Amino acid sequence: MSADNENTPPKGPRFNLNVEDAKARAQEAMRKSEFILSRAYGLLREPKKEWEQIKAEDTTVPHILIGYVAPLAAIPPVCDLIGSALFNRLLTIEPGEALVRAVITWVVSIGLVYFLGVLVNVLADTFDADRNELNAQKIAAYSLTPSFLSGVFSLWPPLWWISLFALAAMVYIMHRGLPVLMKAPEDRALSYAASVTIAAAVAGIVLFSLASCVT
């Protein structure tokens, strides 16, 4: 066998399969990105109609957390990591430590969404709504969509305050979804959403404070 043949990269089904797999994964990522943006737009533009569609979707809690929340929850820590590097904030900490913090933030964010869903379900009786674990997790996951997407502003730290508008959007979206998914009375939906948001904010502060102690 000649030296040229030895240096020739393999041209077989395995190589082609890897290329096809990469293309398939890229296409799937694009579809998922389009779905997330479409859902966020629908929840802000026509929340009642979008919540009705969400209610009809046949899914599971793990699928919501892994398939929808996990990719979204990665946006804030990844953008913060990039923003820190661009603005030289990484000089104050080791890159490895910054990466660990980003991963912990991501995991805690997913856990916080699940906790929020549990809270929505637990408080249902207080606000004359119906308990439903799956619908409560849908409320938590999709209401937090604007908050996760606002993480892109971490790319330029001086714009962090814009993320506060995402909190207002979260309350608005949740308030419109509670009557649809949890059958909450219209006149109690806003106080329901506000109570859940405040409790989740407190829990988030505690969880992220504990997470920061780990690193």
Where are these regions (language model features)?
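Short hydrophobic/aromatic-rich motifs at helix boundaries and adjacent loops
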Residues: 20-24, 91-95, 146-150
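Hydrophobic alpha-helical transmembrane segments and adjacent short intramembrane/lumenal linkers
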Residues: 120-205
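A generic structural micro-environment signature
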Residues: 7, 50, 60, 71, ...
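Juxtamembrane boundary at the C-terminal end of a transmembrane helix
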Residues: 203-215
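Selected alpha-helical membrane-embedding segments in polytopic membrane proteins
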Residues: 2, 28-128
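Transmembrane helix-loop junctions and nearby membrane-interface residues
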Residues: 80-88, 155-158, 181, 212
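A general structural signal for short secondary-structure boundary/capping elements
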Residues: 71, 183-188, 212-214
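Short, non-transmembrane cytosolic segments of multipass membrane proteins
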Residues: 2-37
